[in-house]
């Protein structure tokens, strides 16, 4: 084999020579090797929005680059017969372009389409940290819970710490001693209104918030930011969802039903929702028997169009028709103590017909100037037509049950012809800018308000043949009111606020500071109010599970139609005028709170506590009967509200959310030199919401709601507040519901068109407690008065079904 050795040496030398030559040639100027060209262009998505950090690669030449923030790229490449260029980005389909014998400068416009393949589902559960005064509530917490009113969002609010209600038929609520009218409600940054003439939960019907459309719920019981309007108790901020695919649901129960359907894509979404509610079955448990005909119908639509990253157009429309007809027959109520039971029997003639028809719409056009800055123009309109008419006659007997002694016999006649029309239009401009540490927002709103009312109501009573009040000479009605008023006014509102986040580096303490100011001017009373507000959230470095919160601010209750109605009474005949000298009610909020997050057996919990003090000034006193609030029409008193709210929230049962809250409160006001509690003085309240599953399966789900709250002060009607010497019994109620998941198709593994099917049965007022809503007062000829309680609904069974697709 030795003769082959010279040939191997020669071959090896030739290989080295070839390698050296190739290396030298590669170092020569490119003009000696091959021509080059420049490839440039832009990568966008289907909406022509730039895709940043997309990969542009030519693997044959080992060249790779990334697109800029504007989606642009540039590469210098070698010319060849064909050059293969790949464009790729996570979440998009990879695109390949082949360039044939490219020369000079080549420009490409590349559109990447969304990819079909998605990552596997990953669930990350963590309690949201609250560093401001607005807490975010889970929208699905009440989805399968038992309900009497059908207003799921408001019932969720009523179960929070610091919030109370004494009427399961109503969606209204009191917050830390405030009246029903002191709570602002926003839907997609537009303030919404309630009907004006509603006087009972039976009439109320459906609220403006449709739970099927809700994406996010923000709620604050005090110390809220400057962007929320001139109300001095609470702010409820609702955001409607933008579905990106087809979805819908159907629900039915003995109390009504709802339907929801939505179409969606990346650029366009359209949601439609219809609700129908009838409380005929529920009202049948009241002691007043008769023919109830409540029919409440509501339709809402939400359209959202995002043609590109720069523009967004939203429209919300709502039509609501709440109709309540009632022909009473008779009533029998037994009340008193074990030792002294009294019976109140009434036979009725007449009927009641009420109609509340509202329209609401908003149009928003938003322009984004990059990812950090936006400007939005929002136009909205609200209109309501309301009618409350009744002629009711009752012949009553009040007897002592043990002795059959007649305590009072008589007749009463109630008449009302109340009509109201209102229209509120507004135009709002909102500017927002975000940076690394700041979130700046400001806005200006112009409003036009027009309200007309025509009211005539009276009540006549006689006892044993004598008309009350009995003077012996003159004939008077016990109550009579006439009103014919019109309000036309302009209102301008402006605010500016900043959320500043700082600290947090190298395990330092983190701070969230929100500060702002709000201004409002009302043309009716020529008043200008200025409201500074500030809140601070602290996450200390020594314990990141702890959050401390402090807030202070001057809040005003800008007067609206109800507060303006100043009454004067002569010989039991009341006339109503609008008081142009009325001023805004004032409340100084001082709040200190904390959140502490911890785990028990691997399950997350959060303990929240808040101390608050509200100094109240320029108060307009009012009385409450059922849900009707009647104001004095003038600034006559000052007062305060102070208390503590505690809430424990967490997974009492793995995989479920439950909570229990405790509120203690003291309120006082000074009226005509006398100190007395506010009409909504609720000294204590306990709310609990608990969910559970059957052991070994998640098909069966139980929901339990408990409420225990102190009774409110009250006195005889048409009396001054100084006579509030009584307090109603405590409000106690338990509702329980059991749901069975007939179909679980969340992952779409089955061919069924439905995603979920739930069947449920509820027991409303589980313990059958007779809660007092208000009182009917009987007066005999000697002016002796008897308070007959008007009880709320009794125990009822409700069945329901929910289909989601």
Regions found by a protein language model. Name each.
Residues 42-46, 54-59, 86-93, 102-146, ...:
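Short, acidic, small-residue-rich periplasmic hinge/interaction motif at the N-terminus
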Residues 74-76, 191-219:
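Short acidic/polar hinge/loop motifs at secondary-structure boundaries
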Residues 249, 253-276, 289-329, 352-381:
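Transmembrane beta-barrel wall of Gram-negative outer-membrane proteins
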Residues 281, 329-330, 334, 541-590, ...:
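Surface-exposed extracellular loop regions of Gram-negative outer-membrane beta-barrel proteins
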Residues 306-322, 351-525, 608-611, 659:
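Face-selective signature of the C-terminal outer-membrane beta-barrel domain
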Residues 374-380, 581-635, 640, 759-764, ...:
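Membrane-embedded beta-barrel scaffold of Gram-negative outer-membrane proteins
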Residues 506-507, 612-615, 634-715:
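Gram-negative outer-membrane beta-barrel transporters
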Residues 655-658, 707-715, 740-805:
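C-terminal beta-signal and adjacent terminal beta-strands/loops
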């Amino acid at each position: 084999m030795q003769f082959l050795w010279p040939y191997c040496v020669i071959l090896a030398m030739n290989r080295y020579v070839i390698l050296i030559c190739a290396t030298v040639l590669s170092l020569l100027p490119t003009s000696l090797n091959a021509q080059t060209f420049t490839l440039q262009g832009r990568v966008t998505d289907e909406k022509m929005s730039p895709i940043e950090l997309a990969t542009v690669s030519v693997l044959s030449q080992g060249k790779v680059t990334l697109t800029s923030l504007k989606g642009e790229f540039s590469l210098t490449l070698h010319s060849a017969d064909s050059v293969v260029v790949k464009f790729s980005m996570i979440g998009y389909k990879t695109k390949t372009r082949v360039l044939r014998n490219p020369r000079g400068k080549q420009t490409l416009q590349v559109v990447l389409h969304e990819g079909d393949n998605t990552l596997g589902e990953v669930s990350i559960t963590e309690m949201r940290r609250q560093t401001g005064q607005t807490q975010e509530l889970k929208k699905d917490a009440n989805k399968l819970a038992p309900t009497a009113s059908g207003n799921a969002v408001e019932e969720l609010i009523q179960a929070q710490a610091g919030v109370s209600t004494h009427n399961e038929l109503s969606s209204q609520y009191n917050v830390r001693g405030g009246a029903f009218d002191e709570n602002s409600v926003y839907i997609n940054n537009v303030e919404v209104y309630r009907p004006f003439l509603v006087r009972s939960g039976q009439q109320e019907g459906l609220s403006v918030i449709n739970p099927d459309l809700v994406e996010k719920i923000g709620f604050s019981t005090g110390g809220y930011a400057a962007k929320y309007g001139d109300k001095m108790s609470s702010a409820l901020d609702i955001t409607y969802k933008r579905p990106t695919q087809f979805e819908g649901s159907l629900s039915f129960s003995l109390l009504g039903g709802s339907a929801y359907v939505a179409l969606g894509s990346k650029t366009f979404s359209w949601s439609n929702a219809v609700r129908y509610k009838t409380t005929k079955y529920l009202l049948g448990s009241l002691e007043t028997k008769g023919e109830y005909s409540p029919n409440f119908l509501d339709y809402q639509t939400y359209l959202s169009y995002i043609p590109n990253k720069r523009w967004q157009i939203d429209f919300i429309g709502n039509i609501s028709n709440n109709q309540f007809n009632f022909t009473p027959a008779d009533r029998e109520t037994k009340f008193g103590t074990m030792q002294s039971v009294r019976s109140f029997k009434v036979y009725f003639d007449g009927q009641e017909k009420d109609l509340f028809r509202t329209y609401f719409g908003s149009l928003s056009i938003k322009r984004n100037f990059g990812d950090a800055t936006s400007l939005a123009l929002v136009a909205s309109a609200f209109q309501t037509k309301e009618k409350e008419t009744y002629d009711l006659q009752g012949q009553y007997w009040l007897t002592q049950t043990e002795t059959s002694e007649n305590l009072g016999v008589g007749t009463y006649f109630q008449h009302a012809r109340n009509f109201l029309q209102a229209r509120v239009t507004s135009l709002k401009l909102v500017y927002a800018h975000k940076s690394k540490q700041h979130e700046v927002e400001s806005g200006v709103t112009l409003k036009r308000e027009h309200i007309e009312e025509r009211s005539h109501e009276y009540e006549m009573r006689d006892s044993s043949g004598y008309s009350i009040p009995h003077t012996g000479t003159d004939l008077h009605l016990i109550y009579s009111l006439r009103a014919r008023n019109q309000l036309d006014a302009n209102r301008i509102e402006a605010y500016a606020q900043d959320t500043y986040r700082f600290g947090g580096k190298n395990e330092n303490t983190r701070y969230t500071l929100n500060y702002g100011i709000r201004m409002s001017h009302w043309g009716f009373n020529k008043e200008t109010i200025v409201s500074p507000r500030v809140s601070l959230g602290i996450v200390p470095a020594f314990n990141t599970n702890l959050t401390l919160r402090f807030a202070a601010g001057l809040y005003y209750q800008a007067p609206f139609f109800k507060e303006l109605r100043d009454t004067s009474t002569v010989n039991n005949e009341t006339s109503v005028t609008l008081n142009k000298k009325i001023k805004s009610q004032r409340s100084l909020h001082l709040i200190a709170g904390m959140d502490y997050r911890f785990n028990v057996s691997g399950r997350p919990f959060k303990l929240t506590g808040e101390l608050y003090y509200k100094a109240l000034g320029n108060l307009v006193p009012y009385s409450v009967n059922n849900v009707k609030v009647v104001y004095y029409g003038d600034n006559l008193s000052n007062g305060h509200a102070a208390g503590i709210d505690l809430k424990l929230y967490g997974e009492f049962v793995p995989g479920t959310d439950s909570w229990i809250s405790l509120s203690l409160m003291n309120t006082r006001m000074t009226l005509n030199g006398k100190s007395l509690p506010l009409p909504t003085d609720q000294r204590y309240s306990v709310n609990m919401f608990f969910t559970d599953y059957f052991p070994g399966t998640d098909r069966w789900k139980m929901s339990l709601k408990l409420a225990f709250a102190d009774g409110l002060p009250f006195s005889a009607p048409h009396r001054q507040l100084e006579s509030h010497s009584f307090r109603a019994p405590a409000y106690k109620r338990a509702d329980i519901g059991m749901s069975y998941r007939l179909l679980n198709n969340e992952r779409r593994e089955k061919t069924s068109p439905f995603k979920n099917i739930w069947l449920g049965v509820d027991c409303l007022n589980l313990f059958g407690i007779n809660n007092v809503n208000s009182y009917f007062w009987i007066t005999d000829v000697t002016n002796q008065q008897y308070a007959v309680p008007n009880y709320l609904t009794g125990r009822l069974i409700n069945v329901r079904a929910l289909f989601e697709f």
